[in-house]
Amino acid sequence: RLDGAGLCGGHRDGTILCLGNTLVTAQSVRGLLREHGWEWGIAVIGRLKPFDQFTRLRDIALTHAEPLRCVTLEEGMLSGGFGSLIAEQFAGHALPLDLLRCGVDAFVPAGSKEECAVWAGLAPHQIVQQILQRWPWLAQGDSPKGTDIGQYASPLGDV
């Protein structure tokens, strides 16, 4: 459940940053990660222009001894998109950030929202796989349950 600032849950292991249109996906990803004992928070960003929510992100970042691990979920192009804005904001304020941008970097053929998400690698199981590839220590047992990264392989094979 989101609090008044658009935050959901603890963020010991990382924070998923999303816009309203990707909140359901973020919640699914968080649920899959939670099954393995990882605590990822969700921060919903209300708008990009004007971007007035950096103070909230800075406060999250300052609670971490290490660089803040963030995943951005974006349905638009990666270059110049939501993740780029987040990276620029952190760099501009000299705050450490370890960022994984999950988004589209190619033309997506027509299909249902679910088909397009799978094609673009934005289905929840695919995002979890990207997280585990980016931060392999998560898959190497640094959790109460451990995991097998293969269980998050796409049901359609490599997409």
Which ranges hold each PLM region?
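Thiamine diphosphate
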Residues: 1-159
